[in-house]
């Protein structure tokens, strides 16, 4: 009886007539929410265009109406902004919610798993394909295993449960072969009962989309393990996917920037080296920026930084992959064989929060994701020499951990990024450069890369310099 009422309420909040698959999902969700067992997790796997976001949005609005507690937990700040918008409900990053800072006598803070003081609350995690469970050596967070810590946090609260949603065709976390948070056996390993629902049918409203037509074909090829020849991309008959010759790139990018803004346009590349070439060209030939760093420059954080936000409430730390806009550039200087700048940044995904940082300029140009290890070590030992007069090692390390140069923020330009950096985000205009393809690149990883890149676009996908034999 109550099940039927809950199902009706969710359907009433649905923006359109549910598909048969969505009907099953609504029924399963209602049973999950009303189950007397608390040691149960709901896994909603859905491909692009199958309506999983609409379904969860309807669920959240229903819970709000019934005054039942829910917390939205995406993995990144940008994903939080997107999730909050479609669910009409505040969203927090996983790290912000499940970890708390621990300070040790002026040393750099660590983060331990928080106490879950909520009761009978549904925690909804979007973009769960991005959640890693690889133990990270030297991690500042809990056990270093995000999925372990998430499960521990949620189920330590009385009557609390977890709903994981994501897309198994997307790229798994770096260094992992699959996304553990969308793999039932991984969750059963915590002693949890797993309710699984898969959405595979593209909803009628999305069937005219060339982006989704091709994304659907790509994930079918992944499922069939047919990933060893160049996939054909269907462009004819679709308005949202275009082939772009290289000689039209600058004009088209410029038009997108003028029409939709820098923050709604992105270039996705195969490598950091290729992204660097794009970023250099875009800044010089489209934005006419002559200085290394200008007011208005769009940046992406290259590595987690805990130093500059230690005394800030708005951000616990500056996460790898977060975007920032340069508000002001003040002093630049060269020290230890590296270049630094005092910069005021604005973080658009955190209500335009403003922060003063010391920035390492060298990473803007490296072909690696962040400062290479050898360079990082060189910086460490160069700064350490400044404290050579301190004989007690522990005291020397304290000074290092409080040093603004050793803790300088590492960033890259954000006009062009790799696909892993783009994951979790959405843009109206996505320019996709897959680079020169050889047979050795034709693997399931490439197909997942392509699928993930395709599904970043909400408006138009531009295929830059695509070979004619790949287009139909």
Predicted regions and their residues:
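Conserved helicase motor core of P-loop NTPases
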Residues: 4-6, 25, 29-30, 37, ...
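N-terminal pre-Walker A segment at the start of P-loop NTPase domains
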Residues: 10-30
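Short, conserved phosphate/pyrophosphate- and ester-handling motifs at nucleotide-, phospho-/glycolipid
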Residues: 22, 76, 271, 424
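Conserved adenine-nucleotide phosphate-binding loops and their immediately adjacent elements
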Residues: 2-16, 45
């Amino acid at each position: 009886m109550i099940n039927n009422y809950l199902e009706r309420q969710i359907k009433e909040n649905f923006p359109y007539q549910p598909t048969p698959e969505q009907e099953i999902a609504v029924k399963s969700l209602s049973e999950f929410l009303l189950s007397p067992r608390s040691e149960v997790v709901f896994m909603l796997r859905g491909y692009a265009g199958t309506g999983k976001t609409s379904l969860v949005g309807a669920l959240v609005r229903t819970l709000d109406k019934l005054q039942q507690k829910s917390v939205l937990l995406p993995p990144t700040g940008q994903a939080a902004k997107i999730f909050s918008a479609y669910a009409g409900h505040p969203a927090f990053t996983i790290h912000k919610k499940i970890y708390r800072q621990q300070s040790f006598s002026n040393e750099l803070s660590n983060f331990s798993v928080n106490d879950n003081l909520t009761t009978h609350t549904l925690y909804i995690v979007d973009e769960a394909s991005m959640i890693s469970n690889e133990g990270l050596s030297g991690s500042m967070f809990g056990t270093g295993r995000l999925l372990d810590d998430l499960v521990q946090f949620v189920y330590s609260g009385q009557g609390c449960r977890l709903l994981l949603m994501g897309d198994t065709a997307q790229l798994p976390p770096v260094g992992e072969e699959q996304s553990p948070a969308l793999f039932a056996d991984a969750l059963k390993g915590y002693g949890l009962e797993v309710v699984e629902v898969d959405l595979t049918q593209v909803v009628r409203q999305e069937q005219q989309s060339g982006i989704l037509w091709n994304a659907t074909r790509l994930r079918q090829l992944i499922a069939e393990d047919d990933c060893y020849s160049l996939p054909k991309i269907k462009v004819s008959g679709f308005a949202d996917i275009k082939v772009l010759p290289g000689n039209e790139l600058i004009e088209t990018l410029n038009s997108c920037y003028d029409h939709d803004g820098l923050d709604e346009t992105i270039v996705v590349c195969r490598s950091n080296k290729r992204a660097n070439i794009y970023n250099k060209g875009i800044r010089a030939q489209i934005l006419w920026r002559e200085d290394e760093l200008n007011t208005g420059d769009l940046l992406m954080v290259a590595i987690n930084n805990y130093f500059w936000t230690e005394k800030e409430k708005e951000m616990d730390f500056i996460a790898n992959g977060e975007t920032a806009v340069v508000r002001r550039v003040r002093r630049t200087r060269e020290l230890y064989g590296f270049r630094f700048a005092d910069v005021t940044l604005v973080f658009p995904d955190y209500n335009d929060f403003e922060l003063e940082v010391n920035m390492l300029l060298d990473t803007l140009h490296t072909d690696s994701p962040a400062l290479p290890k050898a360079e990082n070590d060189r910086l460490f030992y160069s700064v350490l020499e400044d404290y050579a007069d301190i004989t007690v090692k522990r005291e020397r390390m304290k000074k290092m951990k409080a040093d603004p140069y050793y803790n300088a923020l590492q960033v890259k330009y954000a006009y062009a990024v790799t696909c892993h950096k783009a994951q979790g985000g959405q843009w109206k205009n996505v320019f996709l450069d897959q680079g020169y393809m050889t047979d050795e690149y034709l693997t399931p990883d490439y197909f997942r890369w392509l699928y993930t890149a395709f599904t970043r676009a909400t408006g138009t996908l531009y295929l830059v310099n695509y070979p004619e034999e790949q287009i139909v």
